[in-house]
A protein has these predicted regions:
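Positively charged n-region of N-terminal signal peptides that target proteins for export
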Residues: 1-4
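N-terminal signal peptide c-region/cleavage motif recognized by signal peptidases
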Residues: 13-15
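A cross-taxonomic marker for long C-terminal extensions/tails that follow the last structured domain
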Residues: 20-27, 104-108, 113-173
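N-terminal targeting signals for Sec/Tat export/insertion, comprising classic cleavable signal peptides
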Residues: 27-48
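Acidic/histidine-rich, surface-exposed loop or edge segments in extracytoplasmic proteins
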Residues: 43-59, 100-105
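Second-shell loop/turn segments in exported
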Residues: 52-63, 89, 108-110, 151
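Histidine-anchored nucleotide/phosphate-binding helix
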Residues: 63-82
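Acidic helix-start/capping segments at beta-turn-to-alpha-helix junctions
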Residues: 83-101
Length: 173
């Protein structure tokens, strides 16, 4: 019996590792390895109300990790056949991550290159993700309103976004 269970475990593990990385919803970002042979899957009949607090400037695959995490979640939900109408995603951006909100022109002026997050920000917005930036962080970093990506909305504070949406039933990711 032990050999049988060990054999099944090895076969299952090989099946998972052989699968390709995919990005079914947010093309090119938030790669996932999807498998139907796992115990817990996103449930297509649930309403997914998710909120992300993005404060770190840490990068993953060339973009801010928090944005990549949102893409990852949308790709997992999409691969599991959860309809877009069942998914609502919001993010609160503040702290060291605030610079991700800059337009390409403003980012170029400040860092000498185009904003590597712009394409992902645009894809997330096209897929209904609401991206809010803390106006306190914007003021602290002396960012002009004209330098903010048009897909980013200013909020009084990151804390107000987090509180309001969690009180509306959003789950913090």
């Amino acid at each position: 019996m032990k050999k049988y269970i060990l054999s099944l475990t090895i076969i299952y593990s090989l099946n998972l590792s052989a699968q390709q990385w995919i990005t079914p919803v947010i093309d090119g970002y938030g790669e996932i390895k999807y498998s139907q042979q796992v115990a817990v899957q996103p449930e297509a009949d649930l309403d997914y109300k998710l909120i992300y607090k993005i404060t770190s400037s840490e990068e993953r695959n060339g973009v801010i990790r928090g944005l990549n995490s949102i893409a990852h979640s949308l790709n997992m939900l999409g691969a599991a056949k959860v309809r877009a109408t069942k998914i609502q995603v919001v993010s609160s951006i503040s702290g060291p991550a605030t610079s991700l909100i800059l337009t390409d022109e403003a980012y170029q002026k400040k860092y000498g290159k185009k904003n590597p997050n712009t394409a992902l920000i645009n894809l997330l917005a096209e897929n209904g993700v609401k991206l809010y930036v803390c106006s306190q962080a914007v003021a602290y970093k002396k960012i002009k309103a004209s330098d903010i990506n048009p897909n980013i909305t200013s909020a009084l504070s990151g804390a107000s976004v987090m509180a309001n949406y969690q009180l509306k039933g959003y789950v913090r990711m």
